[in-house]
Amino acid sequence: YGGPLTVDDLPIDQHQFIALVAPRPIFISGGEYIEGNGVPGTNSRYSLENWQDTPGTFMATAGASPVWKLLGRKPLANKALGLSFDNVPDPVAVKARMPSPLTPLIDGDIAFRQHDQGHVDAPNWPTFIEFAGHYFKSPGFKN
């Protein structure tokens, strides 16, 4: 080994972890980068909320999306915008196609939405409820 193992020693990437959920529905969310006082001990101008790496989260979500199609389910998509991630994506192209914050991609069985309020979940709850309503038919959900 030559030293302690780190995350860099893992022979996997996040899209592979996400793909393990397929073909079950999954909703992945994150917040937008927020300008802040910086990360202590660095020259970063972004606040601590930015450690979540929403662009990387989106790239991992899009990278896992083809597995849903392979298993006969709907890939990551927003039909109104003409966005669909049903092929093995090129990471650079995926990052370029990342939708602006507050744009839900909930037309597939794998879903993503970025809100504009940093590292919290509450702003994405209404979109999650709408996504979950595609699968749960009860009075509390819009169908």
What do the predicted segments below correspond to?
Residues F17-I18, S100:
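FAD-binding beta-loop-beta segment adjacent to the flavin cofactor pocket
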Residues R113, P123-N143:
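Catalytic active-site module of serine/aspartate enzymes centered on a nucleophile-bearing elbow/loop
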Residues S29, L76, G140-N143:
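Residue-level signal for secondary-structure boundary elements
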